[in-house]
Swiss-Prot record:
SUPFAM superfamilies linked to this entry: PhoU-like
UniProt-recorded name of the protein: UPF0111 protein CT_691
Cystine residue pairs: none
Protein origin, superkingdom: Bacteria
Organism: Chlamydia trachomatis serovar D (strain ATCC VR-885 / DSM 19411 / UW-3/Cx)
Protein family (similarity comment): Belongs to the UPF0111 family.
Length: 224
């Protein structure tokens, strides 16, 4: 709690940004995780999945600490409700990453040439959507200093629009993946099919929550 008090003393957004870095540490493992799966290195998949779970637990603990600290009456120049919602959405991103990682340990899955390239494109766009909103949140303390006005605020609104566009691109890629999996020419076992569907849904959850987070940040800036 003393660490959080110090962070809040720097900026009301500093704890959110510290939490964001833990969330980012779960998202950033996804590419190495799926690369290990592609190579058939299931031992590394297990190690990386444990890493994601560890980082998610840390993020969850910090989220709870921030919530308690916000209830302590610390002065804030923005709505407590807004900050609580932002950190809750951020935490849901780490939850999605952990869910995906756990699914990869349920069964020794494999990539198929029919969807491998499309899948990594989908994953890349999804990570980009998160990185865009993360960039916005890292700017929030600077925006506070400038009363959310000027070029920085305009830049943030552009980034929010970028997240929305990336989420739409993710939706289109997800649709293309669905077409592959439901094609009459594509043969995959039932267990593998179910797991891949859940994995794709989990990845989609990251882009959806990134867009939701971007809009909430934008609303917070507009309310100021």
């Amino acid at each position: 709690m003393q660490v959080l008090a110090s962070l809040f003393g720097q900026s009301p957004f500093a704890p959110l940004q510290a939490h964001l870095e833990l969330v980012s540490s779960t998202i950033n493992v996804l590419f190495p995780l799926f690369s290990a799966l592609k190579e058939g290195d299931y031992e590394r998949v297990g190690v990386l999945a444990q890493l994601v779970s560890s980082k998610e637990r840390q993020a969850d603990g910090m989220k709870n600490d921030v919530r308690r600290h916000l209830a302590s009456g610390v002065f804030l120049p923005v709505s407590r409700a807004a900050l609580l919602e932002i950190i809750s959405i951020q935490d849901s991103l780490a939850d999605c990453a952990e869910d995906i990682a756990i699914l990869l340990t349920v069964k020794e899955l494999q990539f198929y040439p029919e969807f491998e390239e499309l899948f990594f494109e989908f994953l890349q766009k999804t990570v980009q959507s998160f990185e865009a909103v993360a960039k916005t949140i890292r700017e929030m303390d600077r925006l506070l200093e400038s009363s959310f006005g000027g070029n920085r605020a305009d830049k943030t609104r552009v980034l929010v629009s970028e997240v929305s566009n990336l989420e739409h691109e993710c939706d289109l890629l997800q649709r293309e993946l669905m077409k592959v999996f439901f094609s009459d020419d594509f043969a995959i076992g039932t267990k593998g099919f179910v797991l891949w569907m859940q994995i794709i849904k989990g990845i989609s959850g990251i882009s959806n929550n990134s867009e939701k987070l971007a809009y909430r940040v934008s609303m917070t800036l507009e309310e100021k």
